[in-house]
């Protein structure tokens, strides 16, 4: 959700090569982002009187949004919006886990989510940065039925979440290293062809580079070159050129 949807489209269109088409309008103006005709993201506009921080929202799939919303409440989380129908696309809600990290839930009908992942300009991973991965991991396992694979190390607090044996997201406990102005939050990783060039383009388009390019891993699953950036409205995300990509 953003404040200026037109300017945001210009930024991401220039950065990732996205095109945009109208989407469901239940929560106000909303567009779907397409890359080569395949949906890769969605951008909605906040009401003019809602002066809220702008961020990318990670959506987690469910077969029953209403039942999942109730389970979230019972497990100490919060349901801030919904569940509501998004036209014929599906049913959704905006929620937060017990530590305050915001995420969405999505019950698919006609729209089953991202149609492309891997090529430059597409989201390739989602990671929760939190105080303690093992503690909040119980919440996500209970609510969504994920299998959790921990990293066996006394120095690393990290869980990979799986569905039917397939890795789908990760939880990274960083303790007091969490930014004080953000708290626990989900991070979206977008693939790029050249991390350094993309980081320069971010600044040329009015965004900011919060951490210059470095060699590392995206969610400890794929090595590559990454940079932490923010769009002109302040939404933070990570760009990554995956090794071998």
Please place each PLM-identified region on the residue numbering.
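Residues in well-ordered beta-strands of folded domains
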Residues: 34, 44, 106, 127, ...
């Amino acid at each position: 959700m953003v404040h200026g949807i037109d300017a945001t489209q210009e930024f991401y269109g220039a950065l990732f090569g996205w095109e945009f088409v109208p989407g469901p309008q239940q929560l106000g103006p909303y567009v779907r982002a397409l890359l080569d005709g395949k949906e890769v993201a969605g951008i909605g506009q906040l009401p003019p009187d809602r002066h809220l921080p702008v961020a990318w929202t990670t959506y987690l799939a469910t077969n029953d949004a209403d039942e999942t919303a109730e389970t979230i409440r019972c497990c100490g989380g919060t349901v801030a919006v919904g569940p509501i129908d998004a036209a014929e696309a599906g049913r959704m809600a905006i929620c937060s886990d017990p530590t305050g990290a915001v995420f969405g839930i999505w019950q698919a009908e006609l729209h089953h989510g991202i149609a492309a992942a891997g090529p430059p300009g597409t989201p390739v991973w989602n990671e929760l940065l939190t105080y303690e991965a093992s503690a909040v991991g119980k919440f996500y396992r209970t609510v969504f039925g994920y299998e959790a694979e921990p990293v066996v190390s006394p120095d690393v607090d990290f869980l990979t979440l799986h569905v039917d044996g397939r890795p789908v997201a990760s939880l990274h406990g960083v303790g007091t290293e969490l930014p004080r102005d953000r708290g626990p939050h989900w991070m979206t990783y977008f693939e790029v062809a050249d991390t350094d060039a993309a980081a320069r383009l971010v600044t040329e388009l009015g965004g900011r580079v919060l951490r210059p390019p470095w060699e590392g891993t995206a969610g400890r699953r794929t090595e590559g070159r990454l940079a932490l950036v923010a769009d002109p409205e302040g939404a933070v995300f990570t760009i990554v050129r995956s090794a071998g990509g």
